[in-house]
Amino acid sequence: MKKITIYDLAELSGVSASAVSAILNGNWKKRRISAKLAEKVTRIAEEQGYAINRQASMLRSKKSHVIGMIIPKYDNRYFGSIAERFEEMARERGLLPIITCTRRRPELEIEAVKAMLSWQVDWVVATGATNPDKISALCQQAGVPTVNLDLPGSLSPSVISDNYGGAKALTHKILANSARRRGELAPLTFIGGRRATITPASVYAASTMRIASWGLACRRRIFWLPAIRKATLRTACRSGLAARRRCCRGYLLTRRYPWKGLCAGCRRWV
């Protein structure tokens, strides 16, 4: 079966090949082509099963209309919702989204970004990257703009959550509930993730500030969990929390991984 070309579509539509190309590439408004004609050509192209030659289009426009994103985890609801919304917004703008999971491994992050750049993506979104500045430097060398999401960098624009403000509000709520139920105030036990990352550090700073504002001493009920493997979480929780189970009045956890560790390690008494 003969492959349909732009010239075939032009003959079927009764317009020039350049007009067909402009319509299929989304540039028909700039050429002052009517919406009615654009709709007609698009319909004929769909009926004929025509597929745009992206490589040829990219050579002409120097744009691939592809946007790449790296994320650290697929099984995390936070990153999963980010990926889903990213795809929706990309398609709304006529872009093809490419997403890959790098599992917070620096070598996978760099490998993924290099692969995206080799396919000449127009943008790279680095979500939760371990070294966002290294990714930004690679993209800058290739002339590709990048943005950091979730974890900030210094070489590209960054969009992050207000972990500090959220932790202040949450700590206030937990303390208020504890005082109402027990009739007295008591410090919380803080269980954080990796201490060097921005989210646990911000949450810890905000929570200790809020606890102090209630007139409570910030006792050393602080546990940093060095890894997210279940065995590590279970061991850390058993050794650090079992001795305090009688006096603990509440917990403040940064993410779901410490919560999994708390449940796995302290199942006997939680």
Curated annotation (Swiss-Prot):
Location of the HTH lacI-type domain: 1-61
GO function term, MF aspect, one: DNA-binding transcription factor activity
DNA-binding region extent: 6-25
This protein's record includes keyword Acetylation: no
Classification via InterPro entries: Cro/C1-type_HTH, HTH_LacI, Lambda_DNA-bd_dom_sf, Peripla_BP/Lac1_sug-bd_dom, Peripla_BP_I
Keywords: DNA-binding, Repressor, Transcription, Transcription regulation
Gene3D superfamilies named among the record's database cross-references: 3.40.50.2300, lambda repressor-like DNA-binding domains
PROSITE patterns: HTH_LACI_1 (PS00356), HTH_LACI_2 (PS50932)
Comment, domains: The C-terminal domain of this protein is probably involved in association of subunits consequent on ribitol binding.
Function: Repressor for the genes of the ribitol operon. Binds D-ribulose as an inducer.
Protein's recorded name: Ribitol operon repressor
Gene: rbtR
